[in-house]
Amino acid sequence: MAKEKFNRTKVHMNVGTIGHVDHGKTTLSAAITTYCAKKYGDKLLKYDEIDNAPEEKERGITINTRHLEYQSDKRHYAHIDCPGHADYVKNMITGAAQMDGAILVVSAPDSVMPQTKEHLLLARQVGVPSIIVFLNKVDLVDDPELVELVEEEVRETLTSYGFPEDTPIIKGSAFKALQEGATAEDTACIEELLKTMDEYFKDPVRDSDKPFLLPIEDIFTIQGRGTVVTGRIERGVIKMNEEVEIVGIKPTKKTVVTGIEMFNKLLDEGEAGDNVGLLLRGIEKKEVERGQVLAKPGSIHPHTKFEAQIYVLSKEEGGRHSPFFSGYRPQFYFRTTDITGTVNLPEGTDMVKPGDNTKIIGELIHPIAMDQGLKLAIREGGRTIASGQVTNIIE
């Protein structure tokens, strides 16, 4: 059979399952892919293929994740499922797999459990835009009133973490929907879930539609032409003769892009994902350095003080062997550069041990271009000891 061409007509979206251990996340993931394989002819992955997820390394942190894909009437979904709780925590904090929407799986016989809450808190902190709840194993609860009570508890929990009270809740049994002889009644919950995902999750803003930003990696002088900076465009589009700002480390400076090159060819414009060289008007080589960014004027500002949520690598992952305390001074790695800074721990936290996840307040010796959601690594002697993202900007 000839290979099928990737269909770009449907909107692409990243989703994932979250929730307490053994509440049925992987079973639900398998039920969705099975349903879609039958309906749309997608490739099928069986439950055990999803559950023994391969290890991935994201900046030296080992994370087990399984990437699935399926399509609905409206979208093409890339879906991540993590087998272990620690994998979820690492995945969400390090932003290894960004989610445009999450499916929170709650077992009806067990209701809300500690990891249900922890995953919701993380989803809120790392900016997962919206959540749909799948209330699983409802066939194991005889009393419909009990199911209603669980639903109420789920809604209260959602609002306590800042998600809307009218978040959709789909009830069903992933296990029943997954069975060989599943009836239309058994799979109705999966059909309803997909329809709700299509309607309730909003289309993600594509990187190319966001304001232009390029982290500077290298700087060259071209005799008779001026200064060229190189890097990969993180977001947005840059056109010839557009004004940009050089942000971070030094005072912000305006300039104009007078040339765009990729693979030694001249372009009229560069877009998110392109590795480009940009010629800057009236800028000397010594005025620019690695670690600064080029950005659309006014779209990003330099900051030194921020809150972040981080995961601290365990000793086995190559992290520290001992805890650290408030006042710890490591290197913070943002985009393309290391900058020295101080880590302060929140009130009530005396120290942070390898393997922990925690909130910190970071303060840098130089300002860098920063916005909420920016990924960071904390390094010591050239090795990564923690990883996470900026959750709030202080100054």
Swiss-Prot record:
Q: Name one GO molecular function term.
A: GTPase activity
Would the keyword Acyltransferase be found if you checked this record's keyword annotation?
no
Give the start-end ranges of region G5. 173-175
Q: Where is this region: G2?
A: 60-64
Where does the UniProt annotation locate this protein? Cytoplasm
Q: Where is this region: G4?
A: 136-139
Q: What is its main location?
A: cytoplasm
The terms describing its cellular component in GO are:
cytoplasm
HAMAP family according to UniProt: EF_Tu_B
Q: Which family does it belong to?
A: Belongs to the TRAFAC class translation factor GTPase superfamily. Classic translation factor GTPase family. EF-Tu/EF-1A subfamily.
- NCBIfam families reported in the protein's UniProt record: EF-Tu, PRK00049.1, PRK12735.1, PRK12736.1, small_GTP
Q: What's the protein here called?
A: Elongation factor Tu
UniProt source species: Treponema denticola (strain ATCC 35405 / DSM 14222 / CIP 103919 / JCM 8153 / KCTC 15104)
Q: Which gene encodes it?
A: tuf
